[in-house]
Amino acid sequence: MVTIDPKELTDLEAVAVTVWWLGGAGFAINAAGRVILIDPVIEPKANSDPVASEIGLPLLVPLPIRARSIDRADAVLLTHDHGDHTAPRTIPELIARTHAVFVCTERTAKTLRNSGLGPQRIRIAQYGRTLKIGDMSITPTVAKHEEERGSTKRGDCCGFLIDAAGVTIWHPGDTELMEEHLRVRDVDLLLLPIAPHTLGTEDAAKLANATGARHIIPCHYGTYDSDLYWCVGDPEAVGARIRDAATRYHVLAVGEKLVLPAD
């Protein structure tokens, strides 16, 4: 079991870029003192049961950190409004305990408003339109997920290209592989969903190789004790298909971190 120290996560004096895997598609980032959360699902279903997740599935390991222990965040980025990304217990805790700005699509924003978040703390994600939050730049990227597959519907899901402390981090979100994705370059860290309802093994490796990302962390697997299609993935199979995986590809335990130097 790996735990995340809330003081380290929220350290204003941090000089590096530290990225923790929260499980699922979720990540916590401290970029030289700036705190970013992506798709955090970090509250239990009930306070007394640390391995019963808030979305109703048992966890393989206890939560590495809880939302109620986080008292500072600059931005919360939500790729879409499914419960394993926009979490029913985590989001209200973060709304109440932090002053974070929430970046999401209009569909997800409706969920946030229903949770009591005021419009001054919501920034609507539009593909390709860069948002500034302090000294960070966040650019939503195109995504197509599940009900959008095979249709012309766009805009309910997104990824995020983040530039913070001189480091570029890309989380494509839950998406099938799209032509636009293959044109993304100059990525320092790729947060790579590998579950079969997202990129899956072959397309995840294809994207990793196309971007030439300097570092890659697989996600969206190995979190819930379930064989549901969106809970499983094979990080070793993905790694076997990635060029120079020994130096680029980092398979983390839930709660484990990767540290990159800030520019």
Predicted stretch roles:
Residues P40-I42, D81, A143-H145, G173-T175, ...:
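Active-site metal-binding loops of divalent metal-dependent hydrolases
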Residues V101, G116-K132, A205, N209-D263:
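Binuclear metal-ion centers of metallo-dependent hydrolases, dominated by the metallo-beta-lactamase
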Residues P6-L9, R34-L77, P88-E93, E148-R149, ...:
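Pre-active-site segment of Zn-dependent metallo-hydrolases
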Residues R34-I36, D74-A75, V101, M136, ...:
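Structural motif
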Residues L12-V17, N30-I36, T130-T139, D163-I169, ...:
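Beta-strand-turn-beta hairpins that frame and shape the catalytic cleft
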Residues M1-P58, G233-E236, A240-A245, E256:
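Zn-dependent metallo-beta-lactamase
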Residues R89, H145-T211:
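Active-site-proximal loop/helix segments of hydrolase catalytic cores
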